[in-house]
Swiss-Prot record:
The chain crosses the membrane at residues 35-55, 152-172, 181-201, 205-225, 242-264, 282-302. Its main location: membrane. InterPro entries: SecD/SecF_arch_bac, SecD_SecF_C, SecF_arc. One of its GO terms (cellular component) is plasma membrane. It comes from the Archaea. Part of the protein translocation apparatus. Forms a complex with SecD. This is Protein-export membrane protein SecF. Involved in protein export. Belongs to the SecD/SecF family. SecF subfamily. It comes from Thermococcus gammatolerans (strain DSM 15229 / JCM 11827 / EJ3). The keyword Cell membrane applies.
Length: 315
C-alpha cells in the first residue's frame, strides 16, 4: 500500500503574506496602460492647480514681521481687527500653543514693506496700549534675507534631485526604470505642493525640508519595486510585484501612522506643516510607486525594448 503524503502545514507568517497578496491582487489585474494613465492624469491636475494657485511664501522666505503675544484676553480675529484699526496695517493673526511652556498665545503676521522694524514697533505699541499685561515679542525678517533663504531652498531641491538622479541611473544603468523613478519623485513633490496650495499651507524653510525628505521616501519605495521586478527571484512578474507591494505597503503605512500621530499630538505650527506635507506626499507616492512605476516596469519587461538595451549594454 502506498503511503499518503503528509500535507505541509503553512507557517503563520506565510498565511499573513498570502492574505496580504489576496487583498492586493486587484493591482495585478490592472492593465499596464491604465496603471500609467491614471497617475499621469492626477499629475496633470496637480500641475494645473500649481499653475493657478501656487503656495504662498512664508515670512522666512519673503520677509516681514511676526509679533508673538501672550496673556491677551482676545481672539485672533479681534486682535487682528484692533491692530488694523489702530495702525492701518493689514495683518493676519492665529492662535498657537507653546510646546515647551504649554502657554497659549497669538501670532500676528504683517507683510514686509520699506521699514519692517518700524511696523513691528507700531504693532507692539498698539497691543501694549490696550492690553497692559500682554507679553509682546516682535521678530523682523528682512526681505533681503528672505530672498537669500528662498534661493538656498531652491538650490537645495535642485541639487538633491540631480544627486538622486545620478545615483539611481548609476545603480540601474537603464534609462526607462531610472527615468520612471525620477518622474515619480517629481510627481510626488508636485502633488504635495498642490495640496499645500489647496490647504493654504505656506512655503517655508520647514516645508522645503519636508519636500527634501519626501525625495528620500520616494526613492526608497521605487528602488525596492524596481529591484524586485528587474532582478526577481520569483517565477513570475506578478509574484515579484505582490512581494514588493506587501513589503512596501508595510513600510509606508507604518511611516504614515507615525506621521499622523505626530500631527495629532503636535502643538507646533512648523511640525504640523511638515507632517501634512509628508502625509500627502507619501499618499501620492503610493500611487506613483505601486501603480505608475509598476505599470511602466510591467510594460518595459515584456517589451522588446528591454532586450535591445541589454544587447547594447553587453557589447
Amino acid at each position: 500500500m502506498g503511503t499518503k503524503k503528509q500535507k505541509t502545514k503553512k507557517k503563520p507568517s506565510d498565511e499573513i503574506l498570502e492574505t496580504k497578496r489576496k487583498r492586493l491582487s486587484f493591482l495585478v489585474r490592472m492593465e499596464p496602460r491604465k496603471m500609467v494613465l491614471y497617475p499621469l492624469v492626477v499629475f496633470l491636475v496637480a500641475a494645473l492647480i500649481l499653475a493657478v494657485h501656487f503656495p504662498e511664501k512664508g515670512i522666512d522666505l519673503k520677509g516681514g514681521v511676526v509679533v508673538t503675544v501672550y496673556h491677551v484676553s482676545a481672539s485672533p480675529d479681534e486682535l487682528a481687527s484692533y491692530v488694523k484699526e489702530k495702525t492701518g496695517i493689514d495683518v493676519r493673526a492665529e492662535e498657537f500653543k507653546d510646546p515647551i511652556t504649554g502657554l497659549s498665545g497669538i501670532r500676528i503676521y504683517a507683510p514686509a514693506k520699506t521699514a519692517p522694524s518700524k511696523i513691528a514697533d507700531e504693532i507692539s505699541n498698539a497691543i501694549r496700549l490696550k492690553y497692559k499685561d500682554a507679553d509682546v515679542t516682535p521678530r523682523v525678517v528682512d526681505p533681503t534675507f528672505g530672498k537669500i533663504a528662498q534661493k538656498q531652498g531652491i538650490k537645495a531641491v535642485i541639487y538633491a534631485f540631480i544627486g538622486m538622479a545620478i545615483v539611481v541611473f548609476l545603480f540601474f544603468r537603464d534609462p526607462v526604470p531610472s527615468g520612471t523613478i525620477i518622474f515619480s519623485a517629481f510627481s510626488d513633490m508636485v502633488i504635495a505642493l498642490a495640496t499645500m496650495g489647496i490647504l493654504g499651507i505656506e512655503l517655508t524653510t520647514a516645508t522645503i525640508a519636508a519636500l527634501l525628505m519626501l525625495i528620500g521616501y520616494t526613492v526608497d519605495s521605487n528602488i525596492l519595486l524596481t529591484t524586485r521586478l528587474l532582478r526577481r527571484k520569483e517565477d513570475t512578474i506578478e509574484d515579484a510585484y505582490l512581494s514588493a507591494v506587501s513589503t512596501g505597503f508595510t513600510m509606508s503605512t507604518t511611516t504614515l501612522g507615525a506621521l499622523f500621530i505626530l500631527w495629532l499630538v503636535s502643538t507646533s505650527e512648523v511640525i504640523d506643516s511638515i507632517t501634512i506635507v509628508l502625509i500627502f506626499g507619501l499618499l501620492a507616492d503610493f500611487m506613483n510607486t505601486w501603480i505608475f512605476n509598476a505599470g511602466v516596469l510591467r510594460w518595459y519587461i515584456a517589451s522588446p525594448l528591454k532586450f535591445s538595451i541589454k544587447l547594447r549594454r553587453g557589447k
